[in-house]
Amino acid sequence: MTTACPARTSSLMDDLLGLLRIRIKRGVNLAVRDISSSDPYVVVKMGKQKLKTRVINKDVNPEWNEDLTLSVTDSNLTVLLTVYDHDMFSKDDKMGDAEFEIKPYIEALRMQLDGLPSGTIVTTVKPSRRNCLAEESRVTWVDGKLVQDLVLRLRHVECGEVEAQLQWIDLPGSKGL
């Protein structure tokens, strides 16, 4: 005797808008937390998701060029980026953090942009007290894709910035934008 399949419950794909690829490019003038340098890495959190880059040893101007990909179910969520100094024998030291909204980027994605020339600036986000931008952030149409470049000024620390770039990945079968 076979049993009937239970009614399908909602899956992650039903709520998933798509994937947000955050390229952590580099750190600039990060704080010294060891004797003469730091061993920095970045942790990115959005909702319950948490991802991290590799550690770059003895460098306050590290180049990660590392992609961290988050699944997006809510465009109102903010992304928290925290830089840490890796320590071998003690707790890792915090080297500052920055927060940014993905909503302006998502809103630009929802526009019909096909046919725009590569390099077209679609929108800009200005630095303000409500965001951690060190300079104006441009959302640009590049080779058929929308990217947003960010220079984030770290908070709760004496100095340091992190350069990052956002890119969207559509997933077949997801709710989409």
From Swiss-Prot:
Effect of residue 85 to A: Impaired Ca(2+)-dependent phospholipids binding and reduced abscisic acid (ABA) sensitivity, as well as altered membrane localization and PYR1 binding
Annotated Ca(2+) 2 binding sites: 34, 39, 85-87
Location in the cell: Cell membrane; Nucleus; Cytoplasm, Cytosol
Keyword Chaperone: no
Domain C2 residues, every copy: 4-118
Family annotation (InterPro entries): C2_dom, C2_domain_sf, CAR1-11
Required cofactor(s): Ca(2+)
GO molecular function (one): calcium ion binding
A GO-annotated cellular component: plasma membrane
Domain of life, per lineage: Eukaryota
Disruption phenotype: When associated with disruption in CAR1, CAR5 and CAR9 genes, reduced sensitivity to abscisic acid (ABA) during seedling establishment and root growth regulation.
Subunit structure: Dimers and oligomers. Binds to PYR/PYL/RCAR abscisic acid intracellular receptors in an ABA-independent manner, both at the plasma membrane and in the nucleus. Interacts directly with PYR1, PYL1, PYL4, PYL6 and PYL8. Binds phospholipids in a Ca(2+)-dependent manner. Interacts with YchF1.
Family assignment from sequence similarity: Belongs to the plant CAR protein family.
Protein's UniProt name: Protein C2-DOMAIN ABA-RELATED 4
